[in-house]
């Protein structure tokens, strides 16, 4: 064995490549070993250093792959054992054990997290060269007994199913020990680069290779200063020193110092020396030179998005200077926090990248499909699961519009559960759903699912066969091919499909002869797919590489950007969270010398120093270290390592927000510039100098010219939210000349509430989602129908009998039977409505002097100027003197307010008065008023009553009164009835004013509607809060940002409120 160390200013790879070349020139076969995470990059680096740029004598690979070179022909043809297969084997083992067999883990038998921990423990045991019987000294002896039962049973299943229990390294080591590879290894040289520690499995293999290979060469970075130190605790080279010292002691050799021809920039060497001096308690009498600072940058940004954008701009600048994407490396402090954001931002700046991390399959449509299939079976055809399965695009041949129509109907008819899905759809509504088409679609969905879900407990092999038959019926494979929209997606889908078929194969192999329920089968496949990962190799090498910062090696790329280096992530603190604690691992390691667990937490300090050292020397030309103030929506501090750099004299640059400028980094990329122009177009203008304004004026002129060529435009508006007028063609179709504009009191209220709401409801005719379950609209219909029947009954029957008959016959109507007898909730609603009817009906019995002239009276009121107002009057009453009045039933409290009417928000009663005046063209003296009747079951607070007497009954009847507009002329006749006339009496002239102003409201609204321009203007009564319908989901209206667009209501003091509003009405309606 030969151990080599060198300073950070030299290239260890070049030194080791020279050693490899010498061995290759002598006829030896050379294996150049790199860590798993670096083998691809190391291969490119080694081949670049070779003069011939390639050779068959030097193979750059990993330990595992090297073992396959030697054992590929001699290894037994057994099944491969991966993590998913291991999880299934442990699941099968746990199925065979009873809870009482496992005192410690019996309750976790079906827990997926526990099974994952078993898989990790089993892999750890293999890497540590330990068996489950070596797990002595655990906190609870019962734990070892349970683990022995589980793992031994799992290993028995592996033997039965012919799985290879040995890892590739174990098979390689066994072949070496048996002397099967002596001839090959005698002509082999092993070169190892990039390691600072070996696992127990690698350590054992290395001892065998050292005895049988021609030579083993290992290199590591250690400074000469550190190598000569006797005390190395806390030294930045502590990990490498321990690594070399352990090897030197074990193999009785002395490490040698070597140098390379390539020497990196002195600035990085000087920074390393300062960093080393800080941690080995020595001092230096110099600081970084001014020109050294050109190679380092410390950035501070507010949050992640700004940080990534600054990096993207800097990368575009490097390209402008002539460098390539492959010259750039981006390192992430927190891979999970940055992974979702960095892709879209780099795409915006048109920067191709390769994320060096396996992607989880959990977000792929195929996994979502399998999960929905499993949940559909487990939860008995729940609607959400069936729809999610369809929306994955992998079930059958359905268009998106078909799925939307199916979803709309199933929500309306409340289709959920197998019983409802299996029966033909028969319920329809005013929208007239295409039931024939929907039933055909229902059959295409239900039949294959029903055939699969009726499977009883049977052999796993039979279940897999039925699953495959089901996949064929729904055209799963063909649909999977149709998902891809690009070559990259095709490659991703191929990898996902391969993992899917591997999981099915493993399940068939492990559970083929085991009896299982379909639910267990689907759950196992789902769990395997959700935990699986896949990796796609980039189509070109000229990409920006992105990976976690703790995987970096010295001198990786000319330009390195390390972002997210906050105190929480740099340094990283790694802790085990498996079935064994670190203390238990340590006790086991004390007993076993050469077989041991890796305890990450015990090596955090020296590993973090090693990582920081590699990071500070990762670049050969320029290193940028960046930290956000806010990461994952939480504030974080500077890393202690970055604070050290600041103490060395490196300035911390506050990058600030990404304001637009005319620097190359801002305008050098068309797509990024366009996106920023759009962003600034949507926000308030920032302050600019005259020079900036001139520049951006020219740029906008140029951009608009380019956009016109592509038929695109940048909208401009004075408000954050704006609407466009309808075109003349649309106006002619929606409001044709010669045909009156149809309005109603409700439509007018909606218009004055928010014009855009009127546009949605009455121009686009958009409706809310329907439902067969009774809502306030259907409740109102029921109450109206009961009172209509009651008031039509002129027989001599007692009033209570009439009421019972009205309720009974209404309940027997087919529509109400269908609505209110569907389930217990609907029956409960009906019971409440019946109580409301019984509570409100007495008010009709008291007013025996009233004669009901008509009910549910349709009217069409001609307002002139091609405006036709239509509606339905619930009831027309006649007093004893012949005067007429209107009653409007309400299921909620309503009261006429003259201020609300003035602002257009309560025109109903006055509109009905105008209609009654047209229907019965008599003098206004014959109208006694228009009123609301609140249909309610009055609630009284008994605490306020000292005793139960007549005052209690009076309070009930007081709540059941008519409230609205009343004629002052009819005051005497109204005083004997249940009319609330206080502050509600109007003279004939005042009633005429109300009628004329009501007409003015309709004419004003109609004029605006016919122009076809509808504003987003919900009303506000105080200028501080918005009471109108904001329609946030559609308009994105925000009260704090868009208050200027809200319509301010006219409000007046309570004193003389009525007279002041009437004066305003006369003025505005020109009376």
From Swiss-Prot:
Complex and partners: Heterodimer of AddA and RexB.
Keyword check for Nuclease: yes
One of the protein's GO biological processes: double-strand break repair via homologous recombination
HAMAP family: AddB_type2
E.C. number(s) listed in UniProt: 3.1.-.-
Transmembrane portions of the chain: none
Family: Belongs to the helicase family. AddB/RexB type 2 subfamily.
Protein's job: The heterodimer acts as both an ATP-dependent DNA helicase and an ATP-dependent, dual-direction single-stranded exonuclease. Recognizes the chi site generating a DNA molecule suitable for the initiation of homologous recombination. This subunit has 5' -> 3' nuclease activity but not helicase activity.
InterPro entries given in the database record: ADDB_N, DNA_helicase_suRexB, P-loop_NTPase, PDDEXK-like_dom_sf, PDDEXK_AddAB-type, Restrct_endonuc-II-like
Additional free-text comment from the UniProt record: Despite having helicase-like domains, this subunit does not have helicase activity.
NCBIfam families, alphabetized: rexB_recomb
Enzyme class: hydrolase
Keywords of the record: ATP-binding, DNA damage, DNA repair, DNA-binding, Exonuclease, Helicase, Hydrolase, Nuclease, Nucleotide-binding
An MF annotation (GO) of this entry: hydrolase activity, acting on acid anhydrides
Cofactors, names only: Mg(2+)
Protein name, per record: ATP-dependent helicase/deoxyribonuclease subunit B
């Amino acid at each position: 064995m030969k151990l080599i160390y060198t300073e950070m200013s030299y290239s260890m790879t070049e030194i080791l490549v020279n050693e490899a070349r010498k061995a290759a020139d002598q006829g030896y076969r050379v294996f150049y070993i790199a860590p798993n995470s670096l083998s691809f990059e190391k291969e490119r680096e080694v081949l670049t250093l070779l003069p011939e740029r390639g050779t068959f004598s030097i193979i750059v690979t990993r330990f595992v792959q090297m073992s396959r070179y030697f054992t590929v022909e001699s290894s037994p043809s057994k099944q491969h054992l991966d993590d998913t297969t291991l999880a299934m084997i442990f699941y099968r083992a746990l199925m065979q054990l009873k809870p009482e067999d496992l005192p410690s883990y019996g309750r976790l038998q079906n827990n997926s997290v526990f099974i994952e921990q078993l898989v990790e423990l089993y892999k750890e045991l293999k890497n540590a060269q330990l068996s489950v019987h070596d797990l002595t000294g655990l906190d609870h002896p019962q734990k070892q007994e349970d683990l022995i039962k589980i793992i031994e049973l799992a290993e028995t299943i592996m033997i039965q199913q012919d799985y290879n229990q040995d890892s590739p390294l174990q098979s390689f080591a066994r072949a070496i020990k048996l002397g099967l590879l002596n001839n090959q290894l005698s002509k082999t040289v092993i070169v190892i680069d990039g390691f600072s520690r070996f696992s127990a499995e690698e350590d054992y293999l290395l001892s065998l290779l050292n005895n049988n290979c021609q030579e083993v060469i290992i290199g590591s970075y250690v400074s000469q200063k550190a190598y000569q130190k006797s005390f190395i605790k806390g030294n930045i080279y502590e990990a490498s020193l321990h690594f070399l010292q352990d090897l030197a002691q074990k193999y009785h050799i002395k490490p040698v110092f070597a140098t390379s021809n390539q020497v990196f920039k002195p600035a990085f060497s000087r920074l390393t020396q300062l960093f080393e001096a800080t941690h080995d308690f020595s001092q230096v009498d110099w600081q970084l030179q001014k020109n050294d600072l050109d190679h380092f940058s410390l950035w501070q940004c507010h949050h992640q998005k700004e940080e990534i954008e600054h990096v993207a701009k800097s990368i575009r600048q490097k390209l402008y200077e002539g460098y390539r994407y492959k010259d750039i490396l981006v390192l992430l402090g927190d891979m999970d926090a940055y992974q979702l954001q960095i892709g879209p931002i780099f795409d915006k700046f048109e920067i191709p990248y390769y994320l060096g991390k396996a992607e989880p399959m959990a977000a792929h449509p195929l996994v979502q499909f399998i999960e929905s299939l499993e949940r559909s079976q487990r939860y008995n055809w729940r609607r959400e699961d069936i729809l999610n399965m369809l929306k994955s695009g992998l079930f059958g041949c359905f268009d998106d519009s078909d799925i939307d129509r199916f979803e709309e109907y199933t929500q309306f008819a409340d289709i959920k559960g197998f019983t409802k899905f299996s029966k033909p759809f028969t319920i329809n509504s005013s929208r007239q759903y295409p039931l024939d088409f929907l039933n055909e679609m229902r059959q295409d969905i239900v039949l294959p699912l029903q055939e699969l879900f009726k499977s009883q407990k049977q052999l796993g092999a039979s279940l897999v066969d039925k699953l495959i038959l089901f996949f064929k019926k729904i055209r799963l494979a063909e649909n999977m091919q149709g998902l891809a929209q690009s070559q990259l997606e095709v490659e991703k889908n191929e990898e996902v499909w391969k993992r899917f078929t591997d999981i099915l194969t493993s399940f068939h192999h492990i559970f083929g002869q085991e009896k299982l329920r379909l639910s267990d089968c689907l759950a196992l496949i789902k769990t395997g797919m959700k935990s699986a990962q896949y990796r796609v190799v980039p189509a070109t090498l000229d990409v920006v590489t992105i990976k976690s910062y703790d995987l970096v090696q010295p001198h990786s790329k000319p330009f390195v950007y390390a972002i997210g280096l906050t105190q929480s992530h740099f340094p990283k603190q790694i802790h085990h969270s498996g079935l064994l604690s670190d203390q238990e691992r340590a006790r086991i390691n004390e007993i076993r010398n050469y077989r041991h667990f890796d305890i990450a937490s015990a090596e955090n300090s020296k590993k973090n120093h090693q990582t920081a050292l590699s990071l500070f020397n990762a670049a050969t030309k320029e290193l940028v270290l960046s930290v956000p103030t806010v990461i994952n929506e939480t504030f974080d501090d500077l890393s202690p390592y970055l604070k050290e750099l600041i103490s060395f004299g490196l300035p911390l640059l506050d990058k600030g927000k990404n304001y637009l400028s005319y620097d190359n980094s801002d305008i050098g990329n068309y797509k990024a510039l366009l996106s920023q122009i759009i962003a600034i177009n949507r926000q308030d203008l920032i302050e600019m100098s005259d020079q900036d304004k001139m520049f951006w004026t020219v740029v906008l002129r140029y951009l608009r010219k380019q956009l016109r060529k592509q038929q695109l435009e940048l909208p401009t508006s004075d408000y954050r939210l704006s609407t466009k007028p309808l075109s003349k063609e649309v106006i002619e179709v929606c409001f044709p000349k010669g045909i009156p504009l149809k309005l109603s009191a409700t439509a007018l209220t909606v218009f004055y509430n928010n014009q855009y709401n009127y546009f949605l409801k009455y121009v686009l005719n958009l409706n809310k989602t329907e439902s067969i379950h009774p809502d306030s609209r259907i409740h109102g219909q029921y109450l109206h129908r009961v009172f209509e029947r009651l008031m039509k009954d002129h027989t001599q029957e007692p009033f209570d009998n009439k009421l019972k008959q009205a309720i009974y016959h209404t309940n027997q109507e087919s529509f109400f039977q269908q609505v209110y007898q569907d389930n217990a909730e609907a029956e409960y609603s009906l019971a409440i409505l019946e109580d409301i009817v019984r509570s409100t009906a007495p008010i009709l019995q008291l007013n025996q002097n009233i004669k009901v002239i008509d009910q549910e009276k349709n009217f069409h009121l001609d307002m002139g100027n091609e405006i036709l107002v239509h509606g339905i009057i619930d009831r027309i009453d006649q007093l004893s003197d012949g005067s007429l009045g209107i009653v409007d039933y309400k299921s909620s409290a309503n009261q006429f307010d003259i201020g609300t009417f003035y602002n257009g928000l309560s025109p109903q009663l006055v509109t009905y008065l105008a209609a009654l005046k047209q229907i019965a063209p008599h003098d206004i003296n014959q109208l006694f008023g228009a009123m609301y009747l609140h249909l309610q079951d009055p609630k009284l607070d008994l605490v306020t009553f000292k005793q139960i007497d007549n005052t209690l009954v009076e309070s009930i009847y007081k709540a059941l009164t008519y409230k609205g507009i009343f004629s002052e002329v009819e005051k005497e006749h109204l005083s004997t009835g249940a009319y609330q006339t206080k502050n509600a009496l109007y003279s004939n002239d005042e009633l005429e004013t109300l009628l004329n102003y009501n007409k003015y409201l309709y004419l004003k609204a109609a004029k605006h509607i016919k122009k076809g321009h509808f504003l987003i203007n919900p009303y506000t009564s105080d200028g501080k809060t918005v009471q109108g319908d904001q329609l946030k989901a559609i308009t994105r209206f925000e009260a704090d940002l868009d208050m200027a667009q809200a319509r301010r209501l006219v409000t007046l003091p309570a004193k003389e409120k009525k007279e002041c509003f009437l004066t305003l009405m006369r003025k505005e309606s020109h009376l």
